[in-house]
Amino acid sequence: MASFRLALIQLQISSINSDNVTRACSFIREAATQGAKIVSLPECFNSPYGTKYFPEYAEKIPGESTQKLSEVAKECSIYLIGGSIPEEDAGKLYNTCAVFGPDGTLLAKYRKIHLFDIDVPGKITFQESKTLSPGDSFCTFDTYCRVGLGICYDMRFAELAQIYAQRGCQLLVYPGAFNLTTGPAHWELLQRGRAVDNQVYVATASPARDDKASYVAWGHSTVVNPWGEVLAKAGTEEAIVYSDIDLKKLAEIRQQIPVFRQKRSDLYAVEMKKP
């Protein structure tokens, strides 16, 4: 398939888990009726975002929320990137994305490897590591193209995107919830940088903005092409963002500016230490 439609669901998150899941499934169905073949939910789609919420809302995978995602992926015959949920496993908590195929099978599970610990004086202090543990593995899976997964803060680490490109990824998806400090400064910049550096499509799915929340998400779910152009971008409100992923266009860009062939592997390397 030379091109396919991607949909990003910028969901308004409430404190009621079941409502979040039900509404997410409704938007997934709507996206499928509009021709989306791959659909992504935002980071922490089933719960408020915050260290005090992660233990309360944590689930096993498979579990109640991911079972609903499996069912709707099969119903709609789509690839579904399940944003992320707080996952509990063996006494530890993770920020985890589950991916489902068109037959409802669990294709992949990715645990955020770079935890969001920052301190910007007078602006924001946040430590995911207070309650979460980091993952320790990469995640790629095959759809109409090969997809690489990261979650939010992972996008700041160029090495992750480079390794995904080396592994043949043509689309990188980052469910994420930047904030009102980092969002306006870095959200689009990082996406365009990752896209141009690695000649890939980059997509981000954010929660919709809720100014009354303890953590206010930036919103602006986005799709960027390998030329660094913004193809589609939401505002701050609840929305579905659609974009056609053109693999022929990607191949043309890689042929026109052949950086992969021109890398000086005799002088430098970015390598994967662990599969």
Curated annotation (Swiss-Prot):
It is found in: Cytoplasm. The modification N6-succinyllysine is found at K68, K123, K130. It catalyses: 2-oxoglutaramate + H2O = 2-oxoglutarate + NH4(+); 2-oxosuccinamate + H2O = oxaloacetate + NH4(+). The modification N6-acetyllysine is found at K68. The keyword Phosphoprotein applies. Keywords: Acetylation, Cytoplasm, Hydrolase, Phosphoprotein. The modification Phosphoserine is found at S26. InterPro entries: C-N_Hydrolase (IPR003010), C-N_Hydrolase_sf (IPR036526), Nit1/2_C-N_Hydrolase (IPR045254). GO terms for cellular component: mitochondrion. It is an enzyme of class 3 (hydrolase). Residues 4-247 form the CN hydrolase domain. The active site is at E43, K112, C152. Homodimer. This is Omega-amidase NIT2. The gene is NIT2.
